Amino acid sequence: MQKIFSENRFKEVLDNLGIKQNDKLLVNSNTLNLMIKYRDKSLPSKMLDILIERVDSNGTLLFPTYNWEFCNGLNYDLLNTKSATGALSNLSLKKNFFIRSKNPIYSFSIYGKNKDEIAQLNHYSCFSLDSPFGYLIRNKGKNLFIDLDYKDAFTFVHVAEEDVSVSYRYHKKFTGKYIDKNKVEKIENFEMYVRKED
């Protein structure tokens, strides 16, 4: 018998996790296996609608729209570079009520009350406390994982590592062409706190 994705069940799960209106919520997800399981290509869209409704316009919803091509010398276009972090993140980028934060490596698609504030953050280092990660920490944000093991997606650990200057990582600079929301091209530098090679 074909299983059907239950929107009500998803809402119940959010209830049980304490996800509510006005929350500041970061959602990491992998919906591919769920789409296969339920044979439902519209599943990311259904989930997105429920999450938007849940946090409401007075809350703030963030999806990771990370892309590491800038680290390999490729151009970064704020409006057109795709996310490498899944269908739900890429779907959010297509919605005109979401905006994208500035960092070319660890950007976020953002909806809600504080989206402009977060999108305007200028953080040279991907994991610094003046990044969207820091915003979530300062504002008691929550992190929801959908069909992901936290060991594969808990990027916040790198924020803690940078904050305490762990000895096994260092700041590595990346330089490349950056195309901003006004289509202005410039050469920009960004840093990522990367693991030292053995």
Language-model-detected regions and their locations in the chain:
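N-terminal and secondary-structure boundary signal
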Residues: M1-D198
